[in-house]
Amino acid sequence: MIDLYFAPTPNGHKITLFLEEAELDYRLIKVDLGKGGQFRPEFLRISPNNKIPAIVDHSPADGGEPLSLFESGAILLYLAEKTGLFLSHETRERAATLQWLFWQVGGLGPMLGQNHHFNHAAPQTIPYAIERYQVETQRLYHVLNKRLENSPWLGGENYSIADIACWPWVNAWTRQRIDLAMYPAVKNWHERIRSRPATGQALLKAQLGDERSDS
């Protein structure tokens, strides 16, 4: 059983996508960010950076004590290696998958997060910041589109943790002031992932938002 400490953000959705695809048993534990749940001492013991997602794996592969982990990229890599799913053992596809996973956690996520902040959450309108992050968002979508024009999935021939990491951020394209039709390869990729049964299940459980066990 895996406890997933979760809020319905792109980073949170990454982990539910993987858990549903892998059909792992997990309990969804909502962290109320609006009420400061991320600062509670019991959560900080699991995620000292006071961010979601975080997991506690009660059945780690080494058979030892429960293993806690924070940072969405680290969690995806851990789960992929534990299950043998969504990360190729072939050298080149594995390298490409990790490359695009790290591109997401180091670039796509932070920049789109700033786009969202200055468009929707900043206490005052700052035209320079809005324009800066809009231009960078468009650049990143262009990079993603170029990759997907030449490869069915980000890592290569197979759906992987790189796709799982990027999709929830792209799924918020309307709030990023992006016209997805301008990026046809991204649009096709987004629709293919949205149509996967596990994606629907993951989004449904996130919408329910209560603690529950998938068994």
UniProtKB/Swiss-Prot annotation:
Binding site for glutathione: R40
The UniProt record lists the keyword Oxidoreductase: yes
EC number: 1.8.4.-, 1.11.1.-
Signal peptide limits: none
Family to which the UniProt record says this protein belongs: Belongs to the GST superfamily. Nu-class GSH transferase family.
GO cellular component: cytoplasm
Miscellaneous remark of the record: The reductase activity of YfcG is unique in that no sulfhydryl groups in the protein appear to be covalently involved in the redox chemistry. Glutathionylspermidine (GspSH) binds YfcG about 10 times more tightly than GSH. Moreover, GSSG binds 100 times more tightly than GSH and 10 times more tightly than the GSH analog, GSO(3-).
GO molecular function: disulfide oxidoreductase activity; glutathione transferase activity; peroxidase activity; protein homodimerization activity
Keywords: Oxidoreductase, Peroxidase
Residues given in the record as glutathione 1 binding sites: N11, Q38, I52, E71, S72
GST C-terminal domain sequence ranges: 90-215
InterPro entries per UniProt: Glutathione-S-Trfase_C-like, Glutathione-S-Trfase_C_sf, Glutathione_S-Trfase_N, GST_C, Thioredoxin-like_sf
Gene label: yfcG
Name this protein carries in UniProt: Disulfide-bond oxidoreductase YfcG
Annotated ranges, domain GST N-terminal: 1-87
Top-rank taxon: Bacteria
Binding site for glutathione 2: R132
Assembly: Homodimer.
GO biological process, any: response to oxidative stress
Mutant phenotype after disruption: Deletion of yfcG decreases the resistance of the bacteria to hydrogen peroxide.
Pfam families linked to this entry: GST_C, GST_N
Chain's role: Exhibits a very robust glutathione (GSH)-dependent disulfide-bond reductase activity toward the model substrate, 2-hydroxyethyl disulfide; the actual physiological substrates are not known. Also has a low GSH-dependent hydroperoxidase activity toward cumene hydroperoxide, but does not reduce H(2)O(2), tert-butyl hydroperoxide, benzyl peroxide, or lauroyl peroxide. Exhibits little or no GSH transferase activity with most typical electrophilic substrates, and has no detectable transferase activity using glutathionylspermidine (GspSH) as the nucleophilic substrate.
